[in-house]
Amino acid sequence: MKRNTRNCREDIAKFPQRLKSALKRLIKDNSHKLFLCCLFVIIGTFAALFLANLINDAFTHRSLSERNYLNIFSLIDGAFSDEQPRKLFWIFETMAALVCFVYFFSSLKPYQAEMYQVTPKIEIPKPYGQKQHGSAWFMPDEEKARIFPAVVLFLADDKIKRLLAEGLRRAEAVDNGQYYHAKPIGIKGNIFDEAGIVLGRNATAIKEQISCITDDVHTMTIGSTGCGKTRTLVLQTLCALALAGEGIVVSDPKGELYHYMHTFLETLGYTVCVIDFNSPRKSMCYNPLQPIIDAVNRGEINEASEKAWDMVNILVEKSEKGEPIWTNGEMAIIVASILAVVYDNQDRPEYQNLTNVYEFISNMSVPAQGEKEIQYKKYLRSIPDNHPARQTLAIANVAPDKTAASFYTSALTTLRLFTNPTTYRITSKSDFDLASFGTEAKKALFYVLPDERETFYPITTILVAQQYELLVVAAKKTGNRLRYRVNFVLDEFGNFSKIETFEKKLTVSRGYGIRWNLFLQSFAQLKLVYGEEVANIAKGNCRYWIYLQSTDIETNKELSEAMGKYTTLTYSLGSSAQKYSNPSSSVNVSLIERSLLTAEEIMNGFERPYSLVISNNSPAVMESPDISKWAFNDMLGLGDKKHNQRLIELDENARPSYDGEIEIKLWKPWLELAAKTRKAVNAENEGHNSMF
């Protein structure tokens, strides 16, 4: 009884709001009729005045020529001068109003459900019933404020004003055709306590409240090429992370992010590193063999071998159709050669690189001049039993010659990229420590990649995987948590090579203070690289899916299913007409199940600035405007399209470049082996001759 009373009170309390909403909807759906009704009322009022005066004058025997029937004021005066014409006027006015009423309500469609506006391009029926067929619905604003806590940018704050002024100076320099050299401006501490992927903003004249994901969770963003993710999400996210002083690792197709961001980061006191495969002569350097070199230098030979296998697992492209022996043989050759190059050159670091690994395989897999035995077999006999390359190299040594030759050829094909002098320059030494991005404050790393080809993604994948492993080791030394949280912001992650056990890395990394923010064009990319099972686990380990736009049908279907179902109304119309009887019609109403958003609505209904966020909470529709409407735009010194192009041009031209000839330093152990062989043969021949 109490429950029914409470429900009744709630219904009564909600009645005015529901009535107001219904009236608004009624007017909106019949706006064309409303205009005609208003027009008819005006004409009808004039007609009522005219007829009331005309009839009254006729019955009172008044001369019709005494009144001007086209003068509205004369008609009003005549209609309200006496009771009789006034009654006539109200009779005619009521008739006009009745005609309007009948016209307005005669053809209303009661089978049109009340609609809810999701985005300007999506309207869906509102929910009805008691959730019999599903209870999914969109996240209300008050819940958004709780789930996505806002970090606040106070525009009058002294630190913010200094950053805005610095950005203005950069913009003015660009307008004047000058490069602006950034310097730290001495901002102590961080402006935000924490930050993350930016989803939206609420701006006033004095502040910007920025909604972002601050928890230790991973995100997966779906956005096809040209959907606007850089200008509505990525730049805002990088700026927010920078103001929080967090570690940043970014994959940057085309290099726009580096050019836009590095000056701002340096102003905040960041150390900015860049591996630039787009302009390799301007790039900093990092040797992919560095973790293996460090392990060998520590005497951790088993660890060095494991790291070599981990690296080669990423480097070697695997085929599910072929026999495993070919892939395993190729990998064994590369691993053994890496261990040989690193272990045998501990006092000659200039030779410890993948270019020398390529040359090692190329020259050791063929016989020396005038010999039949390949150099690998002679090398295997020359190294001690405890040499780390010995057991791995034996795999190829026992294979038939033709099979082993296939291993060597495949290995050389995989490593061919490192024969390029500019690639050698980038990968022959290390200018920074990958682990330092979680142990030292304010460090950012950009991987600039050509957008027209995927050649350098395997190297980038290796460095990302190695950095993760090194960060985990660093975290275990500081209470299983990095001193500074590190954020991987990996655009075009679908082009990355496969990272072994990536799904497990996602599971444990957030506890160490490592967050993965992955950007894909569709879920199909992840499935293609990792297979369906691992891809599903990886998707499950990313708490938030952020949808911008995708033309992939299966991706949109999966998102639709993930959003769930809700209960709404459906109408069916019926009519009957029998002989000798009046026709009749009926409207039947029933509750049905409906997808919160269909795949078609998702695919066609989201354009910037709107995004869809799916998680274990209710789906949220967020609004993040273009960077040009943010204070961040002024801090970065950005402007219109032409200004930004000029900024990139000036910044690129100002970067230091190594323009000299790149000398590749080669180890050449095959020459030593050939010399030893010749010496042994000569000694044997001399001994044989002395017997005679």
Residues covered by each model-derived region:
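Short, flexible active-site loop motifs that bind/organize anionic cofactors or intermediates
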Residues: I42, E492, I546
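Conserved ATP-driven motor cores of ASCE-family P-loop NTPases powering translocation/secretion/packaging/pilus
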Residues: L506-V508, Y512-S611
